[in-house]
């Protein structure tokens, strides 16, 4: 049953324009039902965001795929994720690159994500309880940074932690949010707007 629901989801993602077969294989390899509350397992393969507690959500599969595809990852890409959340996006990244660094502001979510990733034998992830606005400078610079919550403006620390040629993908805004694609070229940053989105806010400073 799960396999049929997964195939339906993959078909939807292809119809929505997701073309990267390596990414689609990673999505197929990650059981989304393991990252949601038991009461919501029946919704795990619907193409929709779901609550995970603490006012946070597991992103819509299309948005996970879209943002990941924009990162243009190779197996050796150095990746930073801001907002571990349930660990679902983290797990997909872990199937695509040799190592993932992930920062989460809410301690309970960080521990739950670590447990889930371990249960799935994904040991190539380093998680940190910290302020996502500050990134993880000691592990940088990064080839790719993905942010799974929306700051009102682009955090300068994340731009600074991009390597030359690196890509930052994040939602930005408060009431009206847009997905931004930022590429570093030396000391310059090229910023493009991708599409309108809706994410929970990226809270600054305050750990929970």
From Swiss-Prot:
Q: Which InterPro entries match?
A: PCMT (IPR000682), SAM-dependent_MTases_sf (IPR029063)
Any idea of its EC number? 2.1.1.77
Keyword terms:
Cytoplasm, Methyltransferase, S-adenosyl-L-methionine, Transferase
Stored CDD domains = AdoMet_MTases (cd02440)
Catalytic reaction annotation? [protein]-L-isoaspartate + S-adenosyl-L-methionine = [protein]-L-isoaspartate alpha-methyl ester + S-adenosyl-L-homocysteine
Where is the protein localized? Cytoplasm
User: What Gene Ontology terms for biological process does this UniProt record contain?
Assistant: methylation; protein modification process; protein repair
**Active site: which residues?**
59
Q: Can you name a GO cellular component term?
A: cytoplasm
Q: Name one GO molecular function term.
A: protein-L-isoaspartate (D-aspartate) O-methyltransferase activity
Question: Which Pfam families does the record match to this protein?
Answer: PCMT (PF01135)
Keyword GTP-binding belongs to the record: no
* Claim: Methyltransferase is one of the keywords in the record: yes
Gene3D superfamilies listed in its UniProt record: Vaccinia Virus protein VP39
Q: What does this protein do?
A: Catalyzes the methyl esterification of L-isoaspartyl residues in peptides and proteins that result from spontaneous decomposition of normal L-aspartyl and L-asparaginyl residues. It plays a role in the repair and/or degradation of damaged proteins.
Q: Which HAMAP family match?
A: PIMT (MF_00090)
Which family does this protein fall into?
Belongs to the methyltransferase superfamily. L-isoaspartyl/D-aspartyl protein methyltransferase family.
Q: Which NCBIfam families match?
A: pimt (TIGR00080), PRK00312.1 (NF001453)
What name goes with this protein?
A: Protein-L-isoaspartate O-methyltransferase
Organism, by scientific name, is Serratia proteamaculans (strain 568)
């Amino acid at each position: 049953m799960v396999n049929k629901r997964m195939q339906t989801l993959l078909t939807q993602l292809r119809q929505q324009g997701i073309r990267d077969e390596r990414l689609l294989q990673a999505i197929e390899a990650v059981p989304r039902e393991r990252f949601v509350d038991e009461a919501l397992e029946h919704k795990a393969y619907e193409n929709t965001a779901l609550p995970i507690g603490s006012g946070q959500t597991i992103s819509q599969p299309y948005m996970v795929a879209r943002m990941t595809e924009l990162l243009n990852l190779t197996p050796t890409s150095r990746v930073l994720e801001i907002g571990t959340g349930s660990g679902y996006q983290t797990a997909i990244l872990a199937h695509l690159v040799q190592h993932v660094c992930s920062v989460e502001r809410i301690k309970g979510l960080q521990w739950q994500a670590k447990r889930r990733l371990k249960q799935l034998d994904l040991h190539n992830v380093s998680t940190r309880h910290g302020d996502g606005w500050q990134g993880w400078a000691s592990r940088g610079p990064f080839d790719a940074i993905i942010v799974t919550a929306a700051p009102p403006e682009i955090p300068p620390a994340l731009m600074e932690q991009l390597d030359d040629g690196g890509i930052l993908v994040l939602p930005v805004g408060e009431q009206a949010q847009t997905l931004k694609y930022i590429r570093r070229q030396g000391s310059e940053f090229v910023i493009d707007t991708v599409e309108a989105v809706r994410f929970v806010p990226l809270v600054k400073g305050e750990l929970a």
